């Protein structure tokens, strides 16, 4: 009888196990399209009407600072993306590869899954106020980033 119960449990769990194993891994580009392009657009330009900042001439500088890297892990699109930390690192690196160029030409350091996990665990109670800190830090370095119209 115990063997029959064990087999029943295994058979009941089999469809869920197969479904989880069958889920395809999406490319960072595909995850960008599915999770980010709705607001930032296919060209990473954001929208003035939607108060979404553009990536070009900004995201590489933001990712070049400690504050900026933490900020990037707390923007609403990342927080609500349902991506795991590895996928978030991959999408962020895709964004940096496509739009992260700075005047120096030096690429931003790629995100790792461990870094994403660590930075997402850091408390950022007000992401708008935190972005202001990032922008102020960059301004002190002589870098202006995309406008951010939030109050």
Where on the chain are the PLM-derived regions?
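Gly/Gly-Pro-rich "capping" loops immediately C-terminal to redox-active cysteine motifs
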Residues: 29, 45-81
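Sequence context surrounding c-type heme c attachment/ligation sites in exported
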Residues: 26-37, 64, 85
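The canonical Cys-X-X-Cys-His
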Residues: 32-42, 91, 95
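Flexible coil segments in periplasmic/lumen-exposed cytochrome c-class electron-transfer proteins
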Residues: 86, 97-151
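N-terminal secretory signal peptides that target proteins for export/translocation
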Residues: 1-4
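Bacterial N-terminal signal peptides
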Residues: 6-16
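Internal catalytic or translocation cores that form aromatic/hydrophobic pockets or channels
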Residues: 80-90, 94-95
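Electrostatic cytochrome c docking/interface patches
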Residues: 15-31, 43-46
């Amino acid at each position: 009888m115990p063997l029959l119960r064990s087999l029943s449990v295994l058979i009941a769990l089999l469809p869920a196990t197969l479904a989880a194993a069958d889920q395809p891994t999406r490319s960072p580009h595909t995850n960008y399209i599915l999770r980010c392009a709705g607001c930032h657009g296919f060209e990473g330009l954001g929208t003035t009407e939607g108060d979404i900042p553009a990536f070009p001439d900004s995201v590489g500088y933001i990712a070049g600072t400690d504050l900026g890297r933490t900020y990037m892990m707390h923007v609403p699109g990342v927080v609500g993306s349902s991506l795991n930390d590895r996928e978030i690192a991959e999408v962020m690196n895709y964004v940096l590869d496509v739009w992260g160029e700075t005047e120096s030409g030096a690429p931003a350091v790629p995100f790792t899954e461990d870094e994403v996990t660590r930075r997402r665990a850091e408390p950022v109670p007000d992401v708008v106020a935190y972005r202001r800190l990032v922008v102020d830090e960059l301004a002190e370095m002589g870098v202006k980033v995309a406008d951010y119209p939030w109050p």
